[in-house]
């Protein structure tokens, strides 16, 4: 039996539960960040925030559905944002359901159209470290993913 086979046997139920936990934590974090007014939505808006104050950004969500796979410009933006986040120790995840993300965050005046939800940044509301349990859970999830060379893990949001 190879190491991959042993790992595959042990981690299938664990990884499913881990993924569901991360999805629920992301849902909670998005709602909490929106309530506190520390959520930035949109690729260009996020790039501006990352350029001006990267030390204040705590988490990044990249969202793209199947219809966005052919959008070369969006993929280039994602690559640049991922590189910037990795360089500045900002945890980052991918979500494959932009419509579900729009339902959680809401496409209000702040977010604009659902097309503006391809990148979401969560910032600290003030100078003090933000102690959100969902953020801590997601940071641990990202750290565990990086330990197995999954630098931008994908998360499925709960229904």
Swiss-Prot record:
Keyword Transport among record annotations: no
The keyword Cell cycle is annotated on this UniProt entry: no
One biological process term in Gene Ontology: regulation of cell cycle
UniProt cross-references to InterPro entries, sorted A to Z: GADD45, Ribosomal_eL30-like_sf, Ribosomal_eL8/eL30/eS12/Gad45
Ranges for region Homodimerization: 43-86
Superkingdom, natural source: Eukaryota
Coiled-coil region list: none
One cellular-component annotation, GO: nucleus
The entry's keywords: Apoptosis, Developmental protein, Differentiation
Task of the protein: Involved in the regulation of growth and apoptosis. Mediates activation of stress-responsive MTK1/MEKK4 MAPKKK.
Quaternary structure, from the entry: Undergoes concentration-dependent homodimerization, which is required for growth inhibititory activity and enhances interaction with PCNA. Interacts with GADD45GIP1. Interacts with PCNA.
Record's comment describing the protein's domains: Two central helices mediate homodimerization through parallel packing.
Family stated for the protein in its record: Belongs to the GADD45 family.
Protein name: Growth arrest and DNA damage-inducible protein GADD45 gamma
Organism placement in taxonomy: Eukaryota, Metazoa, Chordata, Craniata, Vertebrata
């Amino acid at each position: 039996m190879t190491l991959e086979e042993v790992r595959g046997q042990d981690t299938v139920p664990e990884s499913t539960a881990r993924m569901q936990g991360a999805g629920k934590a992301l849902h909670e974090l998005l709602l909490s960040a929106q309530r506190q007014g520390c959520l930035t939505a949109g690729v260009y808006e996020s790039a501006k925030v990352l350029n001006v104050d990267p030390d204040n950004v705590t988490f990044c969500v990249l969202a793209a559905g199947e219809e966005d796979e052919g959008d070369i410009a969006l993929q280039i933006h994602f690559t640049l944002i991922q590189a910037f986040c990795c360089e500045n120790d900002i945890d980052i995840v991918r979500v494959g359901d932009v419509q579900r993300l729009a339902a959680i965050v809401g496409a209000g005046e702040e977010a604009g159209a659902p097309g503006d939800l391809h990148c979401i940044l969560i910032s600290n509301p003030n100078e003090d470290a933000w102690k959100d349990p969902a953020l801590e859970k997601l940071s641990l999830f990202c750290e565990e993913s990086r330990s197995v060379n999954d630098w931008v893990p994908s998360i499925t949001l709960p229904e």
